[in-house]
């Protein structure tokens, strides 16, 4: 798992450049779960990917600024016919999941009036709602807004429970636009719902006035609570203090703190309306001031200090919990910012008796099991305050659940130490093996890195947990060991770094590298969301689905070869049951030589060949499928960039074969691009084809080659405030900037560019090429490149929105496009009827014809060679909802389409083979509507 492990406000150094307001590299090693580990320089590498080379820093407030700019860019119709300008190749977009794997979740709440209704907030995935106890989820955020959610609160008063609030902005962020390492994820204020979470509007007086600077109290909303006695809305804003609204959020007044003071703040309210607040001593500039714990008995009009004498003088983040059954009992969990000599964090825990005004320091009783720090987190490790959660059982003020990486419980409020010989009396989630030797290292059906714990309001044994993989439920919090259920079905907030499509037309397989959720394998069945399978652990990186083997990798370049388990190559060897064959060259054993998300390339014309960069040199393996591929690596010392450069991206051609493009980046000098002919055999002949005038210090993030013309390529530079998109049509002899309207307008910057794809299509009877660019504000495309006058239009706005499109890949054999987003899972786009891939694709779905297509009032589904006939047919819309269904006990079915809205639908049918086995197929159907 990737994490920035130190507090935000320490000063970091990037090759001698002092960068205020950024993380410094951690003194901790990364957790060593199944090879998890982060190279010490990983934070600097990823920071360099997005920083503005002119300032050496990521621009302040860049998330809000780029979203504001992207909101004014043109959009393509999502799933509709209608071209904006010229021969645009429209795609039918939909989310494919994974349906069963979530992502980082900061906020979770249960509806007090209907406990089957839950609202969840993902760090980069928006607000989601479930009305069936977490069995299924629906996105309720506008897809075009900032999807970073940090807190959710309901008005608990009778007659007001339909009113909800959520806040945005992570000051200790894991934001996808810089992969969470360096810069703060500026929020866009507080949002309110008056229809029980169905729709949301921003509260105008909380919107930051300047999206490019820290000028507003609501840039970083940490916690919202609503008084059950008065309805006043209280907000703990990081870097400022505690605010109150007495008019439902229309106006807010500062009660405690000041702008740029108290970097971390929290607030809690009891059932009787008593307020507790805690403010850090740490300030925004890294210095310290007076912080502590405060109490108000008059709805925030006045506050008294109740800081215990044993509370640390200097402290970073603290969180509060008040016992629901005894409002005079409260607890405070604190990360001080200090590290002990043994490498463990200094975490404090206090019990407060609000009735007597006394407090007890119970820090020494927190879990501290023997074992390595990072195998499972045997103590309360918060990752530098990134992961902290705490709650009190509703019927027992002494039953406390708290966690950092791992989740723990105590039945006496940690008045006594946990029983060392009875691990599962205390350990209830996250990791399960304190020795670090158990390969099943995660607690069953649970996940590490805790962000929220919520008890059922009327069933005190039932508890919900939100963490880095989504949402989990236990029905009996007292059971030993605890039994969890994963409730992330359809909660599509996975954070992908990488996406891959196998080359064959109609292949339904997809592969993605996901942060904290490994390499995920999916099969798209054409309707609804696909189930995902984690075939490799850690932070998933690059991968490939080949003819004979599958390949996956985790952070720092640790690539693996995996067997297929069936003749159809639809089942892949799992890391949980098999020892995977390592394939990376010897340098991969040293994470200091590898990038955090490290690229490799398998030659599309010969899957025996893998290209693997190491710093400024290249390795090649020509017998990747040998019994021991590690014996067949060659270091190509003459295929090298100058000292100080590192190869950051590479891609191999499809036609003509064996042309390799490599991109190299430098901290201060302009990036370099190289081309190598006969890359499968050559050890010489590297040709520099760099972009003239490229910005010094710019980071080459991606290279895309035309699949049928290796002389046409696109270079993607990912830094902010530079020209970052170039094209060549002559093999790199000349480059033309094509960023066009993605560049920004002088007042607002354009988005960071992440990846590109070139997709040749035949559309409406004449050739066209679709160019796609993934950005930090969504996916864009054009069929008309015109240098810096190019007009890029946003794809899939109504489904993908402005999610971070980390990687886009295209398949010319059938025109399919896949996009791995950082926070909204995986999307696929397929050509609408009339648009087919450049390579020939049969217009039948396995012996069945669907006609006419497009259709208006009706369509027929006809079996070409019926054996036992059709069984049933369903029609789904682009978001996977069942629209209509038909029984079809024969070889032909008439589908009544009357009254349907125009658009693209998925027609899915089940049929019975001669053996009696029922199988399923699917095909797109364009309905023209009335």
Identify the meaning behind each predicted range.
Residues 1-30, 838-839:
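Bacterial Sec-dependent N-terminal signal peptides
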Residues 7-12, 16, 244, 356, ...:
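Generic detector of low-complexity/intrinsically disordered segments
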Residues 6-7, 842-851, 855-930:
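C-terminal outer-membrane/trafficking sorting elements
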Residues 7, 15-16, 236-239, 707, ...:
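Compositionally biased non-globular segments, especially hydrophobic aliphatic-rich helices
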Residues 24-833:
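Beta-propeller blade termini and top-face loops
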Residues 2, 129, 351, 923-924:
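A general lysine-centric signal
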Residues 831-845:
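Low-complexity, Pro/Thr/Ser/Gly/Ala-rich linker/spacer regions in secreted
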Residues 7, 11-14, 92, 226, ...:
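Alpha-helical and His/Cys-centered functional microenvironments
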């Amino acid at each position: 798992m990737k994490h920035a492990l130190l507090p935000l406000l320490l000063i970091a150094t990037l090759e001698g450049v002092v960068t205020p307001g950024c993380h410094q590299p951690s003194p901790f090693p990364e957790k060593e779960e199944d090879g998890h580990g982060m190279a010490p320089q990983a934070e600097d590498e990823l920071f360099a990917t997005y920083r503005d080379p002119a300032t050496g820093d990521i621009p302040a407030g860049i998330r809000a600024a780029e979203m504001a700019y992207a909101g004014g860019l043109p959009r393509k119709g999502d799933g509709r016919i209608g071209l904006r300008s010229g021969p645009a190749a429209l795609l039918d977009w939909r989310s494919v999941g994974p349906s069963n794997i979530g992502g980082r979740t900061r906020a979770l709440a249960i509806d007090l009036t209907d406990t089957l209704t839950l609202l969840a907030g993902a760090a980069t995935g928006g607000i989601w709602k479930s009305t069936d106890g977490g069995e299924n989820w629906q996105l309720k955020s506008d897809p075009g807004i900032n999807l970073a959610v940090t807190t959710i609160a309901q008005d608990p008063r009778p007659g007001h429970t339909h009113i909800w609030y959520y806040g945005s902005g992570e000051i200790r962020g894991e934001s996808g636009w810089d992969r969470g390492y360096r810069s703060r994820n500026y929020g866009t204020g507080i949002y309110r719902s008056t229809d029980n979470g169905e729709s949301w509007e921003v509260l105008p007086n909380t919107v930051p006035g300047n999206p490019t600077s820290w000028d507003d109290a609501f840039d970083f909303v940490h916690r919202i609570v609503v008084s059950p006695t008065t309805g006043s809305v209280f907000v703990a804003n990081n870097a400022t203090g505690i605010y109150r609204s007495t008019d439902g959020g229309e106006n807010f007044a500062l009660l405690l703190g000041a702008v740029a003071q108290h970097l971390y703040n929290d607030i809690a309210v009891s059932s009787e309306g008593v307020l507790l607040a805690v403010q850090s001593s740490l300030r925004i500039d890294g210095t310290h001031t007076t912080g502590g714990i405060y109490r108000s008995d008059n709805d925030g009009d006045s506050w008294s200090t109740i800081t215990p004498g044993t509370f640390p003088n200097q402290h970073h983040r603290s969180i509060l919990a008040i016992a629901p059954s005894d409002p005079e009992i409260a607890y405070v969990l604190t990360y001080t910012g200090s590290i002990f000599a043994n490498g463990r964090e200094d975490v404090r825990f206090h019990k407060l008796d609000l009735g007597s005004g006394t407090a007890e320091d119970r820090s020494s009783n927190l879990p501290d099991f023997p074992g390595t720090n990072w195998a499972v987190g045997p103590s309360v490790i918060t990752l530098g305050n990134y992961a902290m959660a705490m709650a009190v059982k509703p019927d027992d003020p002494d039953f406390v659940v708290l966690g950092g990486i791992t989740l723990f419980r105590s039945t006496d409020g940690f008045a006594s130490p946990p029983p060392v010989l009875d691990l599962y009396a205390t350990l209830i989630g996250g990791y399960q093996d304190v020795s670090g030797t158990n390969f099943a290292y995660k607690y069953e059906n649970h996940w590490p890195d805790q962000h929220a714990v919520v008890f059922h309001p009327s069933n005190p044994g039932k508890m919900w947990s939100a963490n880095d993989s989504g949402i989990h439920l236990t029905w009996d919090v007292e059971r030993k060991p605890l039994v969890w259920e994963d409730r992330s079905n359809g909660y599509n907030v996975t954070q992908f770094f990488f996406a891959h499509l196998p080359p064959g037309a109609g292949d339904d397989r997809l592969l993605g590298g996901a942060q904290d959720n490994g390499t995920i394998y999916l099969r798209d069945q054409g309707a609804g969301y696909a189930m995902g399978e984690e075939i490799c652990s850690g932070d998933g990186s690059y991968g490939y689905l080949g003819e004979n083997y599958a390949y996956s990798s985790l952070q720092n370049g640790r690539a693996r070869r995996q067997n297929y388990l069936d003749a159809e190559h639809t089942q892949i060897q799992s890391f949980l049951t098999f020892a995977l064959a390592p394939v990376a060259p010897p340098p991969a054993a040293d994470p200091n030589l590898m990038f955090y998300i490290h690229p490799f390339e398998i030659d599309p014309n010969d899957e025996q060949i893998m290209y693997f960069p190491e710093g400024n040199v290249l390795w090649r393996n020509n017998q990747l499928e040998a019994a021991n591929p590690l014996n067949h690596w060659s270091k190509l010392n003459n295929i090298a960039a100058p000292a100080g450069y590192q190869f950051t991206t590479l891609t191999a051609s499809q036609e003509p074969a064996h042309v390799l493009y490599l991109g190299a980046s430098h901290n201060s000098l302009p990036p370099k691009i190289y081309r190598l002919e006969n890359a499968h055999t050559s050890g010489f002949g590297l040709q520099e084809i760099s972009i003239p005038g490229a910005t010094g210090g710019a980071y080459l993030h991606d290279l895309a080659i035309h699949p049928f013309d290796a002389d046409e390529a696109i270079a993607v530079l990912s830094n902010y405030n530079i020209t970052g998109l170039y094209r060549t049509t002559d093999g790199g002899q000349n480059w033309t900037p094509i960023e066009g309207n993605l560049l920004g307008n002088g007042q607002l910057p354009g988005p960071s560019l992440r990846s590109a794809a070139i997709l040749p299509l035949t559309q409406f009877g004449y050739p066209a090429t679709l160019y796609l660019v993934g950005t930090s504000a969504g996916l864009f495309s054009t069929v008309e490149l015109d240098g810096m006058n190019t007009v890029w239009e946003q794809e899939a706005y109504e489904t993908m929105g402005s999610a971070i499109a980390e990687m886009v890949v295209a398949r010319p054999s059938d025109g399919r496009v896949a996009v791995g987003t950082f926070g909204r899972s995986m999307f696929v786009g397929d050509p609408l009827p009339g648009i087919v891939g450049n390579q020939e694709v049969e217009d039948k779905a396995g012996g069945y014809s669907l006609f006419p297509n497009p259709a208006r009032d009706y369509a027929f589904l006809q079996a070409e060679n019926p054996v036992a006939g059709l069984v049933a047919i369903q029609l789904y819309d682009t978001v996977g909802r069942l629209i209509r269904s038909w029984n079809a006990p024969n070889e032909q079915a008439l589908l009544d389409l009357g009254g349907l809205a125009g658009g693209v639908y998925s027609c899915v049918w089940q049929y019975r083979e001669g053996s009696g086995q029922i199988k399923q197929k699917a095909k797109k159907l364009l309905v023209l509507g009335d």
